[in-house]
């Protein structure tokens, strides 16, 4: 072994200065090591040297194994230490005393607050981490075991429902009526009285709970023990009866009613779009519109189109994007208003008009649409099993032209039994405009068919070949042929024979009872027949024959449907006026081969009423 290696083996660097004694001692140790090494080599011989090398390798391998085990043990101990720390934290957390909660009543300048907790009103201190200026009356706060406020929460979201009777003069208290008509005074939480809430609070409030002027009759969420009202709750019964939407229906979707559409646009859109002209001429806008006529002729469709068109026109006037036009169409489910409990129907009507006034106060047009108006507001005194109309009708009248005006609100009613509606509702000043939706004639029927038979529909190749592949010409010919067949005065189209009081007789055809709904049904039948034809023959496309067959099927299905007690009703339905009808006989020949049937004693109303 070289001297430098020996020096490194004994851990003495060459550049380290040594004293004379240390140098002598080191030199002596080197000589002894050399002697011992020579003795060892002479004792073991050549074979011993090889065995010694193997032992060294084994020892090195064992050292590596022990080092790896030691590393794993170190990692295990580290993980165990971390688990012990986590368990210690969990034990400390579980050992903490319980926290209490209370409702903040008021805050003071000396950093103390009044809190209602455990049925007591207490004055408590706040943790330095709490910013007292951000605390709001009625807010939930958390207390530690020393009854110190340590955390600010949100406003209470559960509790009892009470009805607001009135807001007191100070604006911070209210008289509410709870269960069993129990009256009490409660504080109003700041979301109910604040004009501007601080950052962080509006996020917890939806559109129905944002600050607005409270009105008598509002439902409030109340904590009777703390004496606070936290939130205004939307009335579920009104939500069930009212559908707020902007219908996706335009005037272009309606066929055959050009004159009626112009009338209702003049009655509804002009007053909203040109208010200054109405004021200049001292002209009062109409308060309501009645759409009446036979069923299936588009009364409800027109009402939806009015709401859509009015919203877009108002957006254009204001310079807003018409795609984001906003309007409210309150579609009232008429018969669901009726309730067996006395006064409930009237209350629902009040709530509906209250909702309409709230929406209209924003300057947005509101349309209140009563479908099947005759089911709710029938003539007073005509009730058989009840007299509910004697109070429901006056409630509607008081809402339309009572002390409270209806600004930006218009009422639209639809009915196919206008004779059953109370006359007081129909007088001028209430439902001013009355528009009759008549049955379509041949020209109107072509317009309606054009809404359903468009150029985008697949047409059979044979039919296209007749018009040299011109799809528009083929579609136009289809419409003309199907209208000619539907409105032809031929024997196959005869429906009823009516006898008048003077003895005269008249034949009524299916065209006298046609409607937009029937036309849509004919087209739907034809499309279904075209689909079946594709499945059977593999040849796609709609054919003229499909439409003609659908007309025959539609007429044949009506053979057993017409029935009425009063023959005069048929004259009203068909639009006939004049001589009284005393006898009716059906002339339908289709599915049944039996003789024609007289109608003068049957009791049920058919689909045409």
From Swiss-Prot:
UniProt xrefs under PROSITE patterns: AAA
Top-level taxon of the source organism: Bacteria
Assembly and binders: Homohexamer. Assembles into a hexameric ring structure that caps the 20S proteasome core. Strongly interacts with the prokaryotic ubiquitin-like protein Pup through a hydrophobic interface; the interacting region of ARC lies in its N-terminal coiled-coil domain. There is one Pup binding site per ARC hexamer ring. Upon ATP-binding, the C-terminus of ARC interacts with the alpha-rings of the proteasome core, possibly by binding to the intersubunit pockets.
A cellular-component GO term for this protein: proteasome complex
Domain characteristics, as noted in the entry: Consists of three main regions, an N-terminal coiled-coil domain that binds to protein Pup and functions as a docking station, an interdomain involved in ARC hexamerization, and a C-terminal ATPase domain of the AAA type.
Chain intervals for the UniProt region annotation (Docks into pockets in the proteasome alpha-ring): 608-609
Source organism: Mycobacterium ulcerans (strain Agy99)
Pfam families per record: AAA, Prot_ATP_ID_OB_C, Prot_ATP_ID_OB_N
Protein name: Proteasome-associated ATPase
């Amino acid at each position: 072994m070289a001297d430098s290696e020996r020096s490194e083996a004994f851990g003495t660097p060459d550049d380290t200065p040594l004293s004379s004694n240390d140098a002598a001692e080191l030199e002596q140790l080197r000589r002894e090591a050399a002697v011992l090494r020579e003795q060892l080599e002479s004792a073991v011989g050549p074979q011993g040297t090889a065995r010694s090398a193997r032992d060294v390798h084994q020892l090195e391998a064992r050292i590596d194994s022990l080092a790896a085990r030691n590393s794993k043990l170190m990692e295990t101990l580290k993980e165990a230490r971390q688990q012990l720390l986590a368990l210690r934290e969990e034990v400390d957390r579980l050992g903490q005393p319980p926290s209490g909660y209370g409702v903040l009543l008021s805050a003071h300048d000396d950093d103390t607050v009044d809190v209602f907790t455990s049925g007591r009103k207490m004055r408590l201190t706040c943790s330095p981490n709490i910013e007292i200026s951000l605390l709001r009356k009625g807010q939930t706060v958390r207390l530690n075991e020393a009854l110190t406020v340590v955390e600010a929460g949100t406003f209470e979201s559960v509790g009892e429902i009470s009805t607001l009777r009135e807001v007191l003069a100070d604006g911070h208290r209210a008289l509410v009526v709870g269960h069993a008509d129990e009256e009490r005074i409660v504080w109003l939480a700041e979301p109910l009285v604040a004009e501007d809430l601080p950052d962080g609070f509006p996020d917890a409030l939806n559109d129905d709970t944002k600050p607005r002027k409270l009105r008598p009759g509002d439902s409030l969420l109340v904590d009777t023990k703390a004496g606070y009202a936290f939130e205004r709750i939307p009335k579920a019964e009104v939500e069930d009866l009212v559908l707020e939407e902007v219908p996706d229906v335009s005037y272009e979707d309606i066929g055959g009613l050009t004159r009626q559409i112009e009338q209702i646009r003049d009655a509804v859109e002009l007053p909203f779009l040109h208010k200054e002209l109405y004021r200049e001429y001292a002209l009062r806008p109409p308060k309501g519109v009645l759409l009446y006529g036979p069923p299936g002729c588009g009364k409800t469709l027109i009402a939806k189109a009015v709401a859509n068109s009015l919203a877009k026109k108002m957006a254009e006037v204001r310079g807003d994007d018409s795609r984001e036009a906003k309007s409210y169409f309150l579609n009232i489910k008429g018969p669901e208003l009726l309730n067996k409990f006395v006064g409930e129907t009237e209350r629902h009507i009040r709530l509906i008009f209250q909702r309409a006034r709230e929406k209209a106060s924003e300057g947005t047009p509101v349309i209140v649409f009563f479908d099947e108006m005759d089911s709710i507001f029938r003539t007073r005194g005509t009730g058989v099993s009840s007299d509910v109309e004697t109070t429901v009708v006056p409630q509607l009248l008081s809402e339309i032209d009572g002390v409270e005006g209806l600004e930006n609100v218009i009422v639209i009613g639809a009915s196919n039994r206008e004779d059953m509606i109370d006359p007081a509702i129909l007088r001028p000043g209430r439902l001013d405009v009355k528009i009759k939706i008549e049955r379509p004639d041949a020209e109107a029927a072509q317009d309606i068919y054009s809404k359903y038979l468009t150029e985008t529909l697949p047409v059979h190749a044979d039919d296209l070949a007749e018009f040299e592949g011109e799809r528009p010409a083929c579609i136009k010919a289809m419409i003309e042929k199907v209208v000619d067949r539907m409105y032809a005065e031929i024997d196959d189209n005869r429906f009823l024979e009516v006898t008048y009081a003077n003895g005269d007789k008249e034949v009524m055809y299916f065209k006298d009872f046609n409607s937009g709904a029937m036309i849509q049904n004919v087209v739907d039948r034809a499309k279904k027949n075209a689909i079946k034809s594709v499945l059977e023959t593999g040849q796609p496309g709609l054919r003229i024959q499909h439409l003609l067959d659908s007309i025959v099927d539609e007429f044949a299905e009506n053979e057993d449907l017409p029935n009425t007690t009063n023959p005069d009703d048929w004259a009203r339905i068909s639009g006939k006026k004049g001589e009284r009808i005393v006898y009716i006989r059906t002339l339908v020949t289709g599915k049944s081969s039996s003789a024609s049937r007289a109608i003068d004693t049957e009791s049920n109303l058919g689909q045409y009423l």
